[in-house]
Curated annotation (Swiss-Prot):
One of its GO terms (cellular component) is filopodium. Acts as a guanine nucleotide exchange factor (GEF) for RHOA, RAC1 and CDC42 GTPases. Regulates cell migration and adhesion assembly and disassembly through a RAC1, PI3K, RHOA and AKT1-dependent mechanism. Increases both RAC1 and CDC42 activity, but decreases the amount of active RHOA. Required for MMP9 up-regulation via the JNK signaling pathway in colorectal tumor cells. Involved in tumor angiogenesis and may play a role in intestinal adenoma formation and tumor progression. Residues 244-428 form the DH domain. Residues 565-656 are annotated as: C-terminal tail. This is Spermatogenesis-associated protein 13. The gene is Spata13. Pfam families: RhoGEF, SH3_1, SOS1_NGEF_PH. Both the ABR and the SH3 domains contribute to maintaining the protein in an inhibited conformation by associating with the C-terminal tail. Binding of these domains to the C-terminal tail inhibits the activity of the protein by blocking a region that is required for its GEF activity. The keyword Signal does not apply. GO terms for biological process: cell migration; filopodium assembly; intracellular signal transduction; lamellipodium assembly; regulation of cell migration. The modification Phosphoserine is found at residues 82, 118. It comes from Mus musculus. Coiled coil: none annotated. Residues 151-210 form the SH3 domain. One of its GO terms (molecular function) is guanyl-nucleotide exchange factor activity.
Amino acid sequence: MHPASVTTTSQDPCAPSGSCRGGRRRRPISVIGGVSFYGNTQVEDVENLLVQPAARPPVPAHQVPPYKAVSARLRPFTFSQSTPIGLDRVGRRRQMKTSNVSSDGGAESSALVDDNGSEEDFSYEELCQANPRYLQPGGEQLAINELISDGSVVCAEALWDHVTMDDQELGFKAGDVIQVLEASNKDWWWGRNEDKEAWFPASFVRLRVNQEELPENCSSSHGEEQDEDTSKARHKHPESQQQMRTNVIQEIMNTERVYIKHLKDICEGYIRQCRKHTGMFTVAQLATIFGNIEDIYKFQRKFLKDLEKQYNKEEPHLSEIGSCFLEHQEGFAIYSEYCNNHPGACVELSNLMKHSKYRHFFEACRLLQQMIDIALDGFLLTPVQKICKYPLQLAELLKYTTQEHGDYNNIKAAYEAMKNVACLINERKRKLESIDKIARWQVSIVGWEGLDILDRSSELIHSGELTKITRQGKSQQRIFFLFDHQLVSCKKDLLRRDMLYYKGRMDMDEVELVDVEDGRDKDWSLSLRNAFKLVSKATDEVHLFCARKQEDKARWLQAYADERRRVQEDQQMGMEIPENQKKLAMLNAQKAGHGKSKGYNSCPVAPPHQSLPPLHQRHITVPTSIPQQQVFALAEPKRKPSIFWHTFHKLTPFRK
């Protein structure tokens, strides 16, 4: 999550905070972001500004990248082979202001020349002067909590899906607008999405540049509100429109400059030092950890130079930067390689961080380069975040660009182009990261039979409890998990309701869903409510299911449509998970479950499926178009003992 400085324009007097939102006019408010500079020096200020909420659950205990505690603080120690060269020269960089006149006669610009002779197009001091607030420790938290305590609505847009089976965490999909209600913790914020309030990872969202007065329910899908918001924005007062467009342009320019500094620090602060220590790192290890980030750095430098040429410093709202994105849209494809490599980089880095020698080395690199207090894995996440931010920034810029503006058509085309790039990369990343959780889920199921779930599936679409009706009219309560290509049936343990037993599966490629109207079914001679059928294409065998509520049935019907659509999209895009990654995921899951206590018949006891350990980034692949059903929270329906014991010994109709 990139922090933000906050600037406000003139405002009218209003009633005390919280008394009359309609009477106060305090717009536009700009939240212009850069990079996280969290610290502990202003924690008390943050707490004082925070509006005390109602009783809330504790902040989730697990860490959320990029703020994982993998870097140990350096204590004085003797220099060794794991100490980066030049650590004894740590101090303020020697600054030289040089005048560079561009070939087209542009204005002078400052360059930063460090002790190694490398040159950058802007200096750290210039960044501080341009954005004094967000470069200060705790600047973003102070800015957000000031707005919240003043009664303002603060909204953020989701960069990625956040799917969770934890009631205390907020689930959302990429592009959703989330109202931020508390930002006292640097990793987890409290927010509202639709009608639910819970914790969510701060690094998963981007604050809106222009915080406008929104309806009480600020959360909505980005795609659904885009046209409506754009239409409203274009009817605003011209001066307000220009100011808001200026805010977005400045955010794009400022975040791009800070991003370049991050890339430079990674390449010069980490990679350069690692290559000098051949005894610690192999070429293959460095390729795994850093991927093609040096190529990204070269590309982004050229992209920023072109942006600077199109940037109008005197009147930023007149800047025409859309053409820059269109000219470089093919170059952004290099991010796909980096994002696909990123999960492997996290694994390799995590293995190295188990050794104190590497922890000290990477921390020394950070100190030598005078980088902000974020661990290396946090810096390596920034390219993944950046490529997902471009569509959100361009969407907001388009919102405040009139159709008469010279850059309107280019911005619109650039938004569509970058959205497609980000969607493809995000989808590939979600697929890779989902397989670990699916593997752990399978290991937790008692009595699993047949092929591994990953042999055919890579995505959990939906899950929930259904009643399966047999031809004899008997009911069987089962929990179903719908993956791409297959539907898995499980049964709860009679005594331990958190334990699941494998009962069978169905091939979704070989069945069709048929909706059943409420009333008496002639084929089954039963009165049915909230029912649907799965009919085999080959044998015409029919499986009848009933949901508890009409809403549950609607979710299953939508989930079936989503499953078919996702399978087709994967085939069109050639989306396949490498076999070696599937095998590695299963191997890691089996190792994690090895040695646990045994249950009935020496079967491993399954942990509660609702509390499976979270994945890196926690944006696994439950479908984004439907809410996840909390199946573990459902009450067990009452059944007559005689029916239960009569059917206890019978096999499920599902084919194993």
